[in-house]
């Protein structure tokens, strides 16, 4: 089982923001291209417009609690963590290549916070205001704080409706700063835009993708893998942003080609397994896994694992935290448990539904120093997500699912 690794030297702290009450009168509020709502306790932020306008909406609507949470997180780590954070924020700003559209969005977030908070944007632990480089540090957290996750996809004869059903757990080291602060962000593109609209289950100010679905039903999730680090430091892209660009580029009919093209032009620091699910329409398959790292001499950094190259089962694909094509496959109890679940279902003739998919995810939830922050079942054919969230120290496996109509969330704003 993948162990979470921390050190003061590599610590990058994520800025997590929860909603705050607004004291400004309507006459003083700027025009914001976004709205914030709550469904069954989950905050849902919809944004539209230019990248900067989308960023401004995030910063303005999410309120002042982000500064307090960042301060609390840094102080919990002590002076060494604060020093490491400052070093990391400078290094990542100079090392990482950020595409202009994402840079504009991050700058917009900072502008939105300034417009909302004024002098309250100062982070006491840092003794300075929140800046653009803090957004870079936030979006590089997955490069140094590795996560252990589990996913699977079934489709066709294994599902009750003949479509695709995909499950995903995000497991990470428990930190109180992450408790009860997850949000769903819906980024709505204009009709006809080459950039697909998509939703992201995440924490505020992380603009990359950890767990997402786009308007065509394509899903992407991040998983760690022990891959090769790149020797070309001039081309590094935060992997969350590479996954986001993949999802924004992917069309259901050509997802494999679309995602591979993005990943091969965005070199990352670390090894990744990227499970992708897509609507199953009676032929082909409903899943593929992209084994992705900085070894550009092997398949230009990306090896695609499909069912044909994975196992004899023709309607199941499993993904945890080890390669199966880019390197020799290693033993993994979570991987094997999901295969056992599939074998039992096949033997019994029982087709999998959402409740059954969550039961499989429960079987592979991590424990010990890690917890499951969210557990998600995707229905790509119908563009739905079923989301379970952690609450306090209680992980997501114990919560009631929240059903999200992704198609409705992503309709262009009027």
Task: Give the label of every model feature segment.
Residues 1-11:
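Bacterial N-terminal signal peptides that target proteins for export
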Residues 25-115, 157-165, 169-414:
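C-terminal, well-structured catalytic/ligand-binding subdomain of enzymes
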Residues 10-19:
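Bacterial N-terminal signal peptides
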Residues 109-111, 115-167:
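Gly/Pro-rich turn-and-neighbor structural signature
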């Amino acid at each position: 089982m993948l162990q979470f690794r921390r050190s003061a030297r590599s610590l990058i702290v994520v800025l997590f923001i929860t909603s705050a009450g607004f004291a400004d009168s309507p006459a003083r509020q700027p025009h914001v291209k976004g709205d914030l709502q709550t469904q069954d306790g989950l905050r849902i932020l919809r944004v539209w417009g230019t990248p900067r306008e989308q960023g401004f909406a995030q910063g303005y609507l999410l309120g002042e609690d982000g500064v307090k949470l960042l301060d609390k997180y840094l102080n919990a780590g002590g002076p060494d963590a604060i020093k490491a954070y400052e070093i990391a924020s400078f290094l990542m700003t100079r090392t990482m290549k950020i595409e202009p559209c994402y840079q504009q969005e991050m700058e917009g977030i900072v502008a939105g916070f300034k417009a909302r908070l004024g002098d309250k944007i100062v982070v006491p632990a840092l003794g300075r205001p929140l800046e653009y480089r803090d957004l870079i540090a936030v979006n590089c957290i997955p490069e140094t704080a590795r996560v252990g996750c589990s996913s699977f996809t079934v489709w066709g004869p294994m599902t009750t409706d003949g479509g695709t059903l995909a499950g995903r757990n995000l497991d990470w080291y428990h930190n109180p700063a992450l408790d009860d602060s997850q949000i769903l962000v819906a980024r709505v593109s204009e009709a006809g835009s080459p950039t697909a609209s998509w939703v992201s289950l995440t924490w505020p100010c992380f603009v990359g993708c950890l767990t997402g679905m786009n308007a065509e039903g394509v899903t992407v999730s991040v998983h760690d893998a022990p891959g090769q680090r790149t020797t070309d430091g001039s081309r590094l892209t935060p992997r969350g942003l590479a996954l986001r660009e993949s999802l924004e580029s992917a069309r259901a009919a050509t997802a494999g080609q679309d995602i591979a093209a993005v990943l091969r032009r965005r070199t990352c620091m670390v090894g990744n397994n990227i499970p992708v699910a897509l609507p199953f329409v009676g032929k082909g398959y409903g899943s593929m896994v992209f084994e992705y790292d900085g070894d550009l001499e092997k398949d230009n950094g990306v090896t695609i694992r499909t069912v044909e190259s994975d196992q004899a089962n023709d309607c199941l694909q499993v993904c945890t935290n080890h390669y199966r094509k880019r390197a020799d496959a290693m033993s993994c109890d979570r991987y094997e448990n999901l295969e056992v679940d599939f074998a039992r279902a096949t033997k019994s003739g029982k087709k999998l539904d959402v409740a059954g998919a969550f039961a499989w995810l429960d079987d592979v939830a991590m424990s010990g120093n890690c917890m499951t922050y969210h557990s998600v079942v995707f229905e790509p054919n119908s563009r739905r997500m079923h989301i379970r969230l952690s609450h306090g120290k209680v992980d997501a496996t114990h919560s009631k699912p929240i059903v999200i109509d992704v198609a409705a969330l992503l309709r262009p704003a009027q």
